[in-house]
Structure formats: structure tokens, C-alpha cells
A protein has these predicted regions:
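Short, well-ordered beta-strand elements
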Residues: 2-7, 30-33, 79-80, 126-128, ...
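Alpha-helical secondary-structure segments
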Residues: 22, 27-30, 78-80, 156-157, ...
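A structural "hinge/loop" feature
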Residues: 18-23, 88-101, 216, 225-230, ...
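Detector for C-terminal structural segments
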Residues: 250-298, 352, 356-366, 396-563
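Ligand/substrate-recognition segments at binding pockets and active sites
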Residues: 174, 269, 306-414, 448, ...
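Gly/Pro-rich hinge or "lid" segments in bacterial periplasmic/extracellular proteins
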Residues: 64-67, 76-77, 83-159, 170, ...
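Extracellular/periplasmic solute-recognition and catalytic clefts
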Residues: 131-145, 161-230, 258, 262-268, ...
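Surface-exposed binding/hinge segments that line
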Residues: 3-10, 23-106
Length: 563
């Protein structure tokens, strides 16, 4: 259907940062929240702009009447959304911040001060109240004693300490001293062996989460502030190379991800962070099979080099020097016919404070150059200040400002559907298209040269299908195309890291999409002693069994919902 109606809890209240009751949470607050996001041109509007009736027209100024938008307060406890098209995954969007409520009276009283970096600039209706926010230092939350479900909030105080990665021993040191309840460990840090000796039974690896990272190429680079290239001929040669599929595949097969993972994880955990698809392989299932299994079955259509490939997490199915050399030989022949000069220089920038990533990128450089030969390909690593790195990559406002040939970016799902990942490369609206040097919606011959127009057609066909199994099958086709293109070369996920913790295993919420997963501290419990590996594995086994049953039930309910 196109109409979704939600009933709100009468017990839900707004509170100030001091814990004073301000007002009840009403359906009108959800209308106000979406209107505020639209008026302020929120960067997260892409999630709902084309989903909610009338919202796109309001955002683009075709109407100034927000009452034409498909979000209504039917009464104080009933909010209703009307969609432009069926979205079987709509319910999973509702946990995203773009649809969060906002009290109109409070918003008016704060004016331009609303939402500033000050706990008193917003209201709270959840389990915690923010008490302090000191940039690059600490964020502190206190339990909201008046929260409607306070009985399920087991921690009174939450402090999040800023960590820039420059002192890798700091997290473990603070855990050992009792300041932290959770600490990520860095096996290549100077103190790790000592920590490991004292905690050999207590180091546990976190679950891999739904955030996927992948290398991509800048297909239409315009900025060369940070480069090792010394001539226009070198720039042109690199541009020709990255547009060549055999060249991209050669890089893919020459990249030793296990060696890359070892730089932050150590040898014991080197593979525990590895991810091999943009869409996590277990994100959805299709007739009892994981999404990754179905994608693997489709790779036979793309050549013998993909035969028998396994896309499961925590192993590297790509690294293969023989395949890499064969693909490069094909690429070199094709590129030399176009007058390309070798070696191809690929600029890769990295934040100079991120020691683990510097080690990882140097490992990638070593594996690619040793397999393909430094007389053929050179990875030029540029260590930049945090400001320069951010401004030429993550924070760059346009594709033309992206100053690199290779970029390692990531994406996590906004909602429970493969499109949440795969649409990011849509040539009309892709969320990471700028990282490829392309502007969404603008004609670019480079996008067509690598087949992104064909890929976008596959996405559009998949999005027409509402039956979950058939829909996911079509998205598996699109993911298979993306693998073969090597435009996005998956490497790691978040999670999968060695930790010390006093958090009771699997007491925290879990979600593959939205904002109700590990970022929520409701239900979280602490224990006095450090969690042991044995405790963690037993809890994990029980949790996985319960999760499998829960997922099966949810999939059955979804199938009924869309019919």
C-alpha cells in the first residue's frame, strides 16, 4: 500500500537537557520535523524526498504549502505518511533521523540557536539526556529517569571519548586503568603484546557490521594539488587506465586484502574485517539463500575468472596474482594501442594522523606493485593533514574538488533493502558518485564509458519489482555487474576488531539499517569483570540462533505485507 499509519505512545514526553518535562510527543511533531528538514535542505533528504507525496515539489519550490506533503497528524497520537510509490522497506526507514519528530514551540523559542553544539539547544524524548559536548574531547549522556521505559535502561552515565588514532595505546591504557568499559585494540601498537599476555582469554572480536568499505577510481579527475604526476601525459595515461575494465580488474586481483587487514588487526585477526561485496552478503536472503550466495551464482555470466567465487565475509576471494597478471596483460595491450605511457601512477591520499590506515595503504601499495610490477603500476601515497585530506575527499563539495586517483570510502544502509547500497552508484542520484569524479544527473561520457548507464537501468528494473524475492534477485544481478566492473573494489567492513570489554555480550540493540543499532545504549548492561572469550562465544551462539529465527519470521511478515 501507499499509506502508513502509526500510533504513538501516550507516555512519550519531551524533556530539556536538565530533565524537565516540556511537552508530550505528538503526531504534529513528526510533521514539524520533516518540514524543518525540508526547509533547511537537510543532507539526508535523499532518503525520503521521492518517497513521500508532495515532498519533492515542496523542496524544489513548486509549492510553499507544506500541507500538500504526505505527512499528516490525524490526531495527537496518530501520524500518517502517504507514499508516491510502494516501498516494501518503508518501515525500516522510520528509524532514520530524517523522520525524527521536532517540537514546534521549542523550535520557535530557540530560533537560530536550535541544534547548536550545546545540550540545551535540543529536546530529548529517549532514554538519555546529553549533558556535555566538547569538540574533539568528550560527549556525555545521563540516564533520563522519566523516560517511559526507564526500567530497560541499565546504565546511568555514558561518556564517549574522542580518539583520532594517533596514540594507538591510549584506548587499552584507559581500559586497564578503569576509565573505559570498552576499548578497541591495535595489534601492531607497541603495548599490544603486553596487553595480550595479561588478557589472553579476554580479547574478543566484535561482529562485522553493515558498513562496507571499498576502493574506487576517480574517473574524471580535475584537481591535481596532491599528485606525483609531473606531466599532462601521465595524467592522461592514468585517466585512460582507470576507464579500462581489465586494468581495474588487475588492481582488484593484485590487492592482498589479508595483508591490508593485518596492519590494523594483526595476523590473528587479519581476515576478520574483510568484506567482498558492497551489499553485506547476509543483508537479505532470497528463498533461503544469503544475498552473497545468489550473487556468486550469477558471476558465471561474466567469465571464467569468477568461477567458484565465494563472497562470504572474513576471507579474501579476490587476491590472485595469476589472474591479476593476465588481466593486466590484456589491459596493457589495449592501453598501449591508445598511446598510454607506463608506469601508471595512481595517487592515494591518507590522513597523516591515521597510523593504521597509513600502514594499510602502504601494504596495498606493496602488494599491487609486487604483483603487477612497479614498472607497470605505481601507487603514490600522499600523507596529508586532516584538513587537507577531508577537504579533498570526504568533505569536498563537488566532484571536481576530489583530488586523488584512488579513494577508500564506505557506506552503511539507510533502510533494509539492497537498493540502499547499490543506488549510491546510480548516475542520476548516486550518493557516492562524486567520489568517482562524476556529478549525479549530469551527462558525462566517462560514466557511459564504464557502463554506469547500463547499471542504472538494472537498478531501475529492480526497483519496479515489489515481491521481495524477485526484487532481491534483480538487485543481485546489479551487484554481480558491479563486481565484474571493479568500479568499487570491496575490502573491509566496520567491526570485526579485537576488543576488551565489560559490556555484557549481546545486551545492546542490533540493526543492519537505521539508527537503532549499536548507537543506542538502551538495554546495554555492564559487568564488573572483563568479558572472556568463552563468555562471548556462548552468548554469540545463543544470539545467532535467536536472530535466525527472528529474521525468518520478519521475512515471512514482509512477504505478506507487500501482497
Amino acid at each position: 500500500g501507499l499509506t502508513y499509519t502509526y500510533k504513538l505512545r501516550k507516555e512519550a514526553k519531551w524533556y530539556t537537557s536538565e530533565g524537565e518535562e516540556y511537552a508530550p510527543v505528538t503526531a504534529k511533531d513528526f510533521v514539524t520535523g520533516l518540514q524543518y528538514a525540508a526547509d533547511k535542505k537537510s543532507e539526508a533528504l535523499y532518503l525520503v524526498q521521492e518517497s513521500v507525496v508532495g515532498l519533492d515539489d515542496y523542496i524544489n519550490g513548486k509549492t510553499k504549502d507544506f500541507s500538500t506533503v504526505g505527512v499528516k497528524a490525524i490526531d495527537d497520537q496518530t501520524v500518517q505518511y502517504t507514499l508516491t510509490r510502494p516501498e516494501p522497506y518503508w518501515n525500516s526507514k522510520t528509524t532514520s533521523t530524517i523522520l525524527f519528530p521536532l517540537n514546534a514551540d521549542f523550535l520557535k523559542s530557540k530560533g537560530d540557536d536550535f541544534g547548536k553544539v550545546d545540550p540545551s539547544s535540543i529536546l530529548y524524548n529517549g532514554p538519555f539526556l546529553m549533558k556535555s559536548f566538547v569538540s574533539k574531547s568528550v560527549i556525555e549522556f545521563k540516564k533520563n529517569p522519566n523516560y517511559w521505559d526507564a526500567k530497560n535502561v541499565f546504565v546511568d552515565d555514558v561518556k564517549l571519548a574522542y580518539f583520532d588514532g594517533s596514540d594507538q595505546d591510549a584506548l587499552a591504557r584507559n581500559f586497564v586503568e578503569g576509565a573505559y568499559s570498552y576499548a578497541r585494540l591495535y595489534p601492531n601498537s607497541s603495548s599490544f603484546e603486553g596487553i595480550k599476555e595479561k588478557n589472553k582469554d579476554n580479547i574478543v572480536y566484535s561482529l562485522q557490521d553493515a558498513t562496507s568499505y571499498f576502493l574506487n577510481f576517480n574517473l574524471d579527475r580535475k584537481s591535481y594539488k596532491f599528485t606525483a604526476k609531473t606531466s599532462d601525459a601521465e595524467k592522461k595515461s592514468t585517466q585512460e587506465a582507470v576507464l579500462n575494465k581489465n586494468f581495474r580488474q588487475a588492481i582488484n586481483f593484485a590487492y592482498d586484502r589479508t595483508a591490508y587487514g593485518a596492519q590494523s588487526q594483526g595476523e590473528d585477526g587479519a581476515t576478520k574485517i574483510l568484506r567482498n561485496l558492497v551489499v553485506p552478503p547476509n543483508f537479505v536472503s532470497i528463498n533461503g539463500k544469503d544475498f552473497g550466495e545468489v550473487v556468486a551464482s550469477k558471476m558465471v555470466n561474466y567469465g571464467k575468472e569468477w568461477q567458484g567465487i565465494n563472497f562470504a565475509d572474513a576471507q579474501d576471494p579476490y587476491y590472485n596474482p595469476e589472474k591479476a597478471k593476465a588481466k593486466f596483460a590484456e589491459a596493457k595491450k589495449e592501453l598501449q594501442a591508445k598511446g598510454v605511457q607506463f608506469p601508471i601512477h595512481l595517487d592515494k591520499t591518507v590522513d597523516l594522523t591515521n597510523k593504521a590506515e597509513i600502514q594499510g595503504i602502504n601494504s596495498m601499495k606493496q602488494s599491487i606493485e609486487s604483483v603487477l610490477g612497479a614498472d607497470n603500476v605505481v601507487i603514490d601515497v600522499h600523507q596529508l593533514s586532516t584538513e587537507d585530506f577531508d577537504n579533498t575527499s570526504y568533505l569536498a563539495q563537488t566532484a571536481a574538488q576530489k583530488d586523488y586517483d584512488l579513494y577508500n570510502g564506505g557506506w552503511s544502509a539507510d533502510y533494509q533493502d539492497p537498493s540502499s547500497y547499490l543506488d549510491i552508484f546510480n548516475i542520476n542520484s548516486g550518493g557516492v558518485l562524486q567520489n568517482l569524479g562524476l556529478e549525479p544527473g549530469e551527462a558525462n561520457d566517462k560514466a557511459k564509458a564504464v557502463g554506469l548507464d547500463v547499471y542504472t537501468q538494472m537498478l531501475e528494473e529492480a526497483n519496479k519489482e515489489q515481491d521481495p524475492a524477485k526484487r532481491y534477485e534483480k538487485y543481485a544481478d546489479a551487484q554481480a555487474w558491479l563486481v565484474d566492473s571493479s568500479l568499487a573494489i570491496p575490502n573491509v567492513s566496520l567491526g570485526g576488531t579485537p576488543t576488551l570489554r565489560k559490556i555484557v555480550p549481546f545486551s545492546t540493540p542490533y540493526s543492519l539499517a537505521g539508527n537503532k543499532g549499536v548507537e543506542s545504549y538502551k538495554y546495554l548492561k555492564l559487568q564488573d569483570k572483563t568479558v572472556t572469550k568463552d563468555e562471548y562465544e556462548k552468548a554469540k551462539e545463543k544470539w545467532l540462533k535467536e536472530k535466525e529465527e527472528s529474521n525468518k519470521k520478519a521475512q515471512e511478515e514482509l512477504a505478506k505485507h507487500v501482497k
